[in-house]
Curated annotation (Swiss-Prot):
Cellular compartments per GO CC: bacterial nucleoid; cytosol
Keyword annotations: Cytoplasm, DNA-binding
PANTHER family in alphabetical order: NUCLEOID-ASSOCIATED PROTEIN YBAB
Known function: Binds to DNA and alters its conformation. May be involved in regulation of gene expression, nucleoid organization and DNA protection.
Region of interest (Disordered), residue spans: 93-113
Database matches in SUPFAM superfamilies: YbaB-like
One Gene Ontology MF term: DNA binding
Protein name in UniProt: Nucleoid-associated protein CBO0032/CLC_0052
Pfam families: YbaB_DNA_bd
Organism of this sequence: Clostridium botulinum (strain Hall / ATCC 3502 / NCTC 13319 / Type A)
Domain of life per record: Bacteria
Protein backbone atom coordinates (compact mmCIF):
# COMPACT_ATOMS: atom_id res chain seq x y z
CA UNK A 1 0.00 0.00 0.00
CA UNK A 2 1.42 3.28 -1.03
CA UNK A 3 1.13 6.10 1.49
CA UNK A 4 -1.24 4.20 3.77
CA UNK A 5 -3.98 4.05 1.15
CA UNK A 6 -5.98 1.13 -0.07
CA UNK A 7 -4.49 -1.10 -2.76
CA UNK A 8 -5.94 -0.70 -6.24
CA UNK A 9 -7.98 2.34 -5.18
CA UNK A 10 -6.86 5.72 -6.33
CA UNK A 11 -7.03 8.57 -3.83
CA UNK A 12 -9.68 10.33 -5.88
CA UNK A 13 -11.93 7.27 -5.74
CA UNK A 14 -11.58 7.05 -1.97
CA UNK A 15 -12.32 10.76 -1.55
CA UNK A 16 -15.36 10.37 -3.77
CA UNK A 17 -16.57 7.42 -1.69
CA UNK A 18 -16.11 9.39 1.54
CA UNK A 19 -18.07 12.34 0.12
CA UNK A 20 -20.89 10.03 -0.92
CA UNK A 21 -20.98 8.47 2.55
CA UNK A 22 -21.10 11.90 4.20
CA UNK A 23 -23.91 13.01 1.88
CA UNK A 24 -25.85 9.83 2.62
CA UNK A 25 -25.44 10.44 6.35
CA UNK A 26 -26.69 14.02 5.99
CA UNK A 27 -29.63 12.90 3.86
CA UNK A 28 -30.53 10.19 6.40
CA UNK A 29 -30.45 12.70 9.28
CA UNK A 30 -32.68 15.05 7.31
CA UNK A 31 -35.07 12.19 6.53
CA UNK A 32 -35.21 11.21 10.22
CA UNK A 33 -36.25 14.75 11.10
CA UNK A 34 -38.92 14.72 8.42
CA UNK A 35 -40.20 11.29 9.49
CA UNK A 36 -40.65 12.49 13.07
CA UNK A 37 -43.16 15.06 11.80
CA UNK A 38 -45.18 12.60 9.70
CA UNK A 39 -48.29 10.90 11.00
CA UNK A 40 -49.88 7.67 9.81
CA UNK A 41 -53.44 6.79 10.73
CA UNK A 42 -55.45 3.62 10.48
CA UNK A 43 -59.15 3.20 11.09
CA UNK A 44 -60.78 -0.16 11.76
CA UNK A 45 -64.20 -1.50 12.62
CA UNK A 46 -66.01 0.72 10.16
CA UNK A 47 -64.64 3.86 11.78
CA UNK A 48 -64.99 2.60 15.35
CA UNK A 49 -61.31 2.94 16.29
CA UNK A 50 -58.59 5.12 14.80
CA UNK A 51 -54.93 4.97 15.78
CA UNK A 52 -52.26 7.47 14.75
CA UNK A 53 -48.54 6.71 14.73
CA UNK A 54 -45.66 9.06 14.02
CA UNK A 55 -42.63 8.39 11.86
CA UNK A 56 -40.70 7.31 14.95
CA UNK A 57 -43.17 4.41 15.14
CA UNK A 58 -44.87 5.65 18.30
CA UNK A 59 -48.64 5.67 18.79
CA UNK A 60 -49.54 9.32 19.36
CA UNK A 61 -53.34 9.22 19.34
CA UNK A 62 -56.24 6.80 19.63
CA UNK A 63 -59.86 7.67 18.97
CA UNK A 64 -62.70 5.37 20.01
CA UNK A 65 -66.29 5.94 19.01
CA UNK A 66 -68.46 5.76 22.15
CA UNK A 67 -70.93 3.30 20.63
CA UNK A 68 -68.27 0.54 20.42
CA UNK A 69 -67.57 0.68 24.14
CA UNK A 70 -69.48 -2.30 25.52
CA UNK A 71 -68.51 -3.40 29.00
CA UNK A 72 -69.78 -6.88 28.15
CA UNK A 73 -67.41 -7.16 25.18
CA UNK A 74 -64.13 -5.54 26.18
CA UNK A 75 -62.22 -8.15 24.18
CA UNK A 76 -63.68 -6.85 20.89
CA UNK A 77 -62.61 -3.30 21.75
CA UNK A 78 -59.12 -4.50 22.68
CA UNK A 79 -58.87 -6.32 19.34
CA UNK A 80 -59.97 -3.21 17.44
CA UNK A 81 -57.43 -1.03 19.27
CA UNK A 82 -54.64 -3.53 18.65
CA UNK A 83 -55.57 -3.85 14.99
CA UNK A 84 -55.67 -0.08 14.45
CA UNK A 85 -52.32 0.40 16.21
CA UNK A 86 -50.65 -2.39 14.25
CA UNK A 87 -51.95 -1.02 10.94
CA UNK A 88 -50.78 2.53 11.73
CA UNK A 89 -47.34 1.24 12.74
CA UNK A 90 -47.17 -0.88 9.57
CA UNK A 91 -47.87 2.22 7.47
CA UNK A 92 -45.10 4.12 9.29
CA UNK A 93 -42.66 1.24 8.75
CA UNK A 94 -43.51 0.93 5.06
CA UNK A 95 -43.04 4.66 4.50
CA UNK A 96 -39.75 4.66 6.39
CA UNK A 97 -38.47 1.66 4.41
CA UNK A 98 -39.49 3.31 1.16
CA UNK A 99 -37.63 6.51 2.05
CA UNK A 100 -34.49 4.61 3.10
CA UNK A 101 -34.51 2.64 -0.17
CA UNK A 102 -34.94 5.86 -2.11
CA UNK A 103 -31.97 7.48 -0.36
CA UNK A 104 -29.69 4.46 -0.55
CA UNK A 105 -30.58 3.43 -4.07
CA UNK A 106 -31.92 0.13 -2.74
CA UNK A 107 -28.75 -0.80 -0.84
CA UNK A 108 -29.48 -2.88 2.23
CA UNK A 109 -27.95 -1.05 5.19
CA UNK A 110 -28.93 -2.99 8.34
CA UNK A 111 -29.70 -0.93 11.41
CA UNK A 112 -30.48 2.31 9.58
CA UNK A 113 -34.01 2.37 11.04
Amino acid sequence: MARGGFPNMGGANMNNLMKQAQKLQQDMEKMQGEMEKKEFSATVGGGAVTAVANGKKQIVDIKIEPEVVDEDDIEMLEDLIMSACNEALKKAEEDTSSEVKRLTGGMNLPGMF
